[in-house]
From Swiss-Prot:
GO molecular function, one term: DNA binding
Classification lineage: Bacteria, Bacillati, Bacillota, Clostridia, Eubacteriales
Cited PANTHER family: TRANSCRIPTIONAL REGULATORY PROTEIN YEBC-RELATED, TRANSLATIONAL ACTIVATOR OF CYTOCHROME C OXIDASE 1
Protein name: Probable transcriptional regulatory protein CBO3073/CLC_2975
UniProt family annotation: Belongs to the TACO1 family.
Disulfide bridge positions per record: none
Subcellular location: Cytoplasm
GO cellular component, one term: cytosol
Top-rank taxon, per record: Bacteria
Presence of keyword Transcription regulation: yes
InterPro entries: Integrase-like_N, TACO1_YebC-like_2nd/3rd_dom, TACO1_YebC_N, Transcrip_reg_TACO1-like, Transcrip_reg_TACO1-like_dom3, YebC-like
Length: 246
């Protein structure tokens, strides 16, 4: 699977994540509320909650914070009713973009997302305009460390049911089907591995190469979207220039 670098900016992205950790914890807290309302507070019987907890741990959310969020969600009988919406559209140079939101006010969210698109030369589209360009996949990203053998890790992941294993720059990336994500993640967790990322994502079927000028404009659009409290995930098919940094 060469021809594009999906993981080249993981470390730069991780630095930004560190700077925005409080906002990320708030967003994950909203996901916990939705998961608990749908399937209850027990991770043993609630697969969606297990997935959110894995995402929380990959983002270094402390265990006591996770537990408090679950208790708070299970105790709030009149908790805010969040609606899940996915907006679709095009960034600069026709980049395909999906934006997942969890919101208690869809008019506010729609306006904010539309503004982010149009400000940088993109535009929101109708439902289905770009979603066919993506597949739902489980993705687990593991930092390369001394003592972590690549071949052993690859066999571990593939034996557990992973579809693909890649080694790139400073990380290993494991891709799974949506259905097998939990099984593979738990198998790797059982080996004591820690993750930089562990979640189900919309992965593009193909990537669109962009130049530095477009990358700069598109990054501004991504920053506005990711800074919005209602936006949970942003997926796109842009291939950033080699060596380009945010």
């Amino acid at each position: 699977m060469s021809g594009h670098s999906k993981w080249h900016n993981i470390q730069a992205k991780k630095g930004k994540v560190d700077a925005k950790r409080g906002k990320i914890f708030t967003k994950i807290g909203k996901e916990i509320v939705v998961a608990v309302k749908q399937g209850g507070p027990s991770a043993d019987s609630n697969p969606r909650l297990r997935d959110v907890i894995a995402k929380a741990k990959a983002n270094n959310m402390p265990n006591d914070t996770i537990e408090r969020s679950i208790k708070k969600a299970s105790g709030e009988l009149n908790a805010v009713d969040y609606e899940t919406i996915t907006y679709e559209g095009y960034g600069p140079a026709g980049i395909a973009v999906l934006v997942d939101v969890l919101t208690d006010n869809k008019n506010r969210s729609a306006g904010n997302v539309r503004y982010a698109f149009t400000k940088q030369g993109g535009n929101m589209g109708s439902t289905g305009c770009v979603s066919f360009m993506f597949q739902s996949k489980g993705q687990i990203v593991i930092e390369k460390k001394d003592g972590l053998d690549e071949d052993e890790l690859m066999m571990m992941a593939l034996d557990a049911g992973a579809e693909d294993f890649e080694s790139e720059d400073e990380v290993y990336a494991v891709t799974t089907s949506q259905e097998d994500f939990g099984t593979v993640r738990e198998a790797l967790e059982a080996e004591g591995l820690e993750f930089l990322e562990a979640e189900i994502k919309m992965v593009p079927n193909t990537y669109t190469a962009i130049d530095e000028e477009t990358a700069t404009k598109f990054q501004k659009m991504l920053d506005v979207l990711e800074d919005d409290d209602d936006v949970q995930n942003v997926y796109h098919n842009a291939e950033f220039p080699e060596g380009w940094e945010e």
